[in-house]
């Protein structure tokens, strides 16, 4: 279990997170949602030890700050919003970087398995810089999967931290990536994903954390968090949530959204 207790972050002179508390469970996909500048990425970067913070973050009861970098690398893998590679690496070389960080390097075929999992079999010899943005994003996901391929190792759950994992993808590959996240969680691992697409969040998340202005506005199951009132408050526009008869799955109708004023413009990107 990953617990976040009273996390505060200041970037420069600007307070970004204000006393965030949240819990993420292994076996679940936890989605962090909110308007641009709400603090989603900052919170994720605090949880991955990339951003200084005050407060406490615990992984399976141990303070995350007490872990050595190599220990964290065997327990969790991070997919950032964007990854720039300056050198002309092939796709296979990029995915192999995940083996250097994790503990699954003994499986020589693992990079190929990871590429197959993201639908990129046969791309091993291509240069990363020659791929489309969506293909590069899937290569990076394959690298992350190779790092923590087994969702549970030595009896301990491992974690995927995904920052907008479907931002560059078409709808088919969006579904594929979210299914990978769900499958990883069902295998006993934990997944924490920053999401913008509320419909995908409703479809795939087990737990939703809704941020607004650097604070946790609501947390719980999608149906508990994603209500007309709460989402409209968070996003500063009128939103209508609907449920489809089969399975009562929550979904939104974006074409019914109406601006209610400049509630969230000119905010720091989250």
UniProtKB/Swiss-Prot annotation:
It comes from the Bacteria. Gene3D superfamilies: P-loop containing nucleotide triphosphate hydrolases. SUPFAM superfamilies: P-loop containing nucleoside triphosphate hydrolases. Residues 2-238 form the ABC transporter domain. The keyword Metal-binding does not apply. Disulfide bonds: none annotated. One of its GO terms (cellular component) is plasma membrane. Keywords: ATP-binding, Cell inner membrane, Cell membrane, Membrane, Nucleotide-binding, Translocase, Transport. It is found in: Cell inner membrane. Its EC number is 7.6.2.-. GO terms for molecular function: ATP binding; ATP hydrolysis activity. ATP binds at residues 34-41. It is a peripheral membrane protein. The complex is composed of two ATP-binding proteins (HmuV), two transmembrane proteins (HmuU) and a solute-binding protein (HmuT). NCBIfam families: PRK13548.1. Part of the ABC transporter complex HmuTUV involved in hemin import. Responsible for energy coupling to the transport system. Belongs to the ABC transporter superfamily. Heme (hemin) importer (TC 3.A.1.14.5) family. This is Hemin import ATP-binding protein HmuV. The gene is hmuV.
């Amino acid at each position: 279990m990953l617990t976040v207790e009273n996390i505060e972050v200041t970037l420069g002179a600007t307070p970004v997170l204000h006393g965030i508390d949240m819990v993420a469970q292994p076996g679940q996909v936890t989605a962090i949602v909110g308007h641009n500048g709400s603090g989603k990425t900052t919170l994720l970067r605090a949880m991955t030890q990339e951003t200084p913070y005050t407060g406490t973050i615990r992984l399976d009861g141990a303070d995350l700050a007490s872990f050595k970098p190599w220990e964290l690398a065997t327990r969790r893998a991070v997919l950032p919003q964007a990854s720039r590679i300056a050198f002309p690496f092939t796709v296979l070389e990029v995915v192999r970087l995940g083996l250097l960080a994790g503990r699954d390097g003994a499986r020589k075929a693992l990079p190929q398995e990871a590429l197959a999992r993201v639908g990129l079999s046969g791309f091993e010899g291509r240069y990363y810089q020659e791929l489309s943005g969506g293909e590069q994003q899937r290569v990076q996901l394959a690298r992350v999967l190779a790092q923590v391929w087994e969702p549970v190792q030595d009896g301990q759950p491992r974690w995927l931290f995904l920052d907008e994992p479907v931002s560059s993808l078409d709808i088919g590959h969006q579904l594929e990536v979210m299914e990978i996240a769900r499958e990883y969680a069902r295998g006993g691992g934990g997944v924490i994903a920053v999401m913008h697409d509320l419909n995908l969040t409703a479809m795939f998340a087990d737990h939703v954390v809704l941020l607004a202005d650097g604070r946790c506005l609501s947390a719980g199951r999608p149906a508990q968090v994603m209500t007309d009132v709460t989402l409209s408050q968070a996003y500063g526009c009128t939103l209508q949530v609907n449920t489809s008869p089969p399975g009562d799955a929550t979904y939104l109708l974006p074409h019914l959204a109406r601006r209610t004023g400049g509630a969230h413009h000119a905010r720091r990107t989250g």
